């Protein structure tokens, strides 16, 4: 479009200029310094190939950008050289005087951060070695620190105000029952260590005797003493230091007879019920209690190593968590990789998919009912109307008998069969009841078909078969044309009432409606619409000539008096627009025959009627005439009455 071959060439003089105009970041510093700006300007001013104005503008933009880059780089280089020269060659500078031998020179590398900045290379999936990385992965138990928190604090054992001094130290409880640690963090005990733990617990249990009696009993037991901070400054502080008072919790006894000590002891080993405590109260009374021996007490069995925490499972090497191997996708290649021209043309010409029936729901419920009831199967089983009575519908279906169609079955045999009902016979046509004559004479039929009299009054154009108005003979007798005089008209019987209505009063136009008369018969109405009427186009010429004569008679009186007449006086007797149009058409007919001349000074203005060249020849038209052929034709010819639209 705008490119030239020398511009797109990689080694061309304007290649870098074009690239600088469209992709400035693509050029390096070396390429910018290599570009010869004067030579590029010369190539643009005097090109070897004619270039478009837009291409020249792009090249000039590239030259400006390259020149701007060059000046920027030159300014940066000169500034850097100036700073170095200013630091190294200032006045009186010398290494011996200014800088000692062991002094450290503080160098500012802020300007060289970008130069010495090391970018970490991108990590690619191809460099990922799973075996090398997974070899350094340790177990979760090996890298997790052991918890040294005393979980016995949760039971408020170390609280000085929660007990009566016989709970023991926390280190003793840890020694007896072990620290409450998560099972996943406990080391797996060996059989030798388990025996030692059991031996230590038996010795500690013999030193501290625990006895279960009633809920309300008070037990004094010997064992390791603990300073009772609650009773040191109160009454009861005279208890022996080696004696501890323990009151069992009645709530725990009611729930099942398990006290706090029983909870701890039941975690590791069964409760031992053979301890006896001999205590002496402050009154010197000795109490000797017999231990409560249950009847069936099973001997304690040694703890198995499986009762402690098990070895943590290696989730990665479990059978159920095996890595699912993905199936290699099978590459499917088409057997035919190319489409032939014949197949392509056949596919383009195939329009069978557009000829399918569209299966869409009808837009309205009425259309839906028509689609259902208009089906062929529905029509062969159901009547045309809706029948809600099931019994009546079944009777209708019984009458539906199918017969095989026989081509030799003629219509005569069909009419003679019993299944042909009289109601199916052809009825008489309405014009046959009126005794209309269907036989039309050949000479009249050759001239053209009968014309509807209702539309004859509206016709404003001249047909080829009609006699033009200008060819009329405006002689002394103003007779009809020659063809009209010798035309034989078939006599048409007319009723007296209708004939009286068809007579026109020449003194004053009387436009009557034949359909408004109560005396008109059906035959007269059909004749008005063209049924049985034998009138032709030639009768229309006589009709228009009679109207023109009537208009000329109206106008001649005003012309003889004042020399001119107005068209508004002619249309004063018109009752509707149709009658006014007929009068205007008759006026134009007279003007065309030069009987009168019309003039209109402005659009939609008054039409002035003046006498024409043949006015005197047409004026005797208004005088009485002897009875002749013309009067005979006038009396014998029926005129169609005017009807309002």
UniProtKB/Swiss-Prot annotation:
Answer yes or no on keyword Cytoplasm: yes
Region entry Disordered, spans: 292-311, 495-527, 619-645
UniProt keywords, alphabetically? Cell cycle, Cell division, Chromosome, Cytoplasm, Mitosis, Nucleus
Family classification = Belongs to the rad21 family.
Q: A biological process (GO) annotation for this entry?
A: meiotic cell cycle
Q: Which CDD domains match?
A: Rad21_Rec8_M_NXP1-like
Q: Which domain of life is it from?
A: Eukaryota
**What is the role of this chain?**
Cleavable component of the cohesin complex involved in chromosome cohesion during cell cycle. The cohesin complex is required for the cohesion of sister chromatids after DNA replication. The cohesin complex apparently forms a large proteinaceous ring within which sister chromatids can be trapped. At metaphase-anaphase transition, this protein is cleaved and dissociates from chromatin, allowing sister chromatids to segregate.
Listed name of the protein: Sister chromatid cohesion protein 1
Q: How does it assemble?
A: Component of the cohesin complex, composed of the smc-1 and smc-3 heterodimer attached via their hinge domain, scc-1 which links them, and scc-3. Interacts with smc-1, smc-3, scc-3 and tim-1.
Q: Which organism is it from?
A: Caenorhabditis elegans
Report the locations given in the UniProt record: Nucleus; Chromosome; Cytoplasm
Q: What happens when the gene is disrupted?
A: Postembryonic RNAi-mediated knock-down results in either larval arrest, or adult sterility with a protruding vulva phenotype. Worms have defective chromosome segregation.
Q: Which GO terms describe its molecular function?
A: chromatin binding; damaged DNA binding
State a single Pfam family of this protein. Rad21_Rec8_N
Cellular-component GO terms for this entry: cohesin complex; cytoplasm; MIS12/MIND type complex; nucleus
